[in-house]
């Protein structure tokens, strides 16, 4: 029975629609040598920064890497973070025609 199901999936691969928050994940790497005198927070000496697809972008990237036919439906701002997300999706050949760009919102970023 499982073999029949697998054969059906191979004959007609499913298309998956991913709906959700498309966000930019930012990772900051550095070292801490001291604490700020104004507040009890660490002062980070930045060594490198990475940015990648987050939220629904992470899901659609994983589906794409698995070879699954998929499409993304989401909203991002008309800002530099939105540009970066659109470029990263395009680099992975992920369909972006259903990603709406609005100048009235800012693209969500997580650090």
Protein language model regions, located:
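Positively charged, low-complexity intrinsically disordered leader regions
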Residues: 1-33
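Substrate-binding N-lobe of the ribokinase-like
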Residues: 2-4, 8, 14-15, 37, ...
């Amino acid at each position: 029975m499982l073999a029949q199901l697998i054969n059906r999936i191979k004959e007609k691969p499913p298309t998956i629609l991913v709906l959700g928050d498309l966000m930019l994940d930012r990772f900051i790497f550095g070292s801490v040598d001291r604490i700020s005198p104004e507040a009890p927070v660490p002062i980070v000496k930045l060594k490198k920064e990475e940015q990648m697809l987050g939220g629904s972008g992470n899901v659609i990237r994983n589906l794409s890497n698995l070879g699954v036919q998929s499409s993304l439906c989401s909203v991002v701002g008309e800002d530099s973070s939105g540009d970066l997300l659109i470029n990263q999706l395009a680099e992975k050949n992920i369909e972006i025609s259903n990603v709406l760009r609005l100048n009235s919102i800012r693209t969500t970023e997580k650090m």
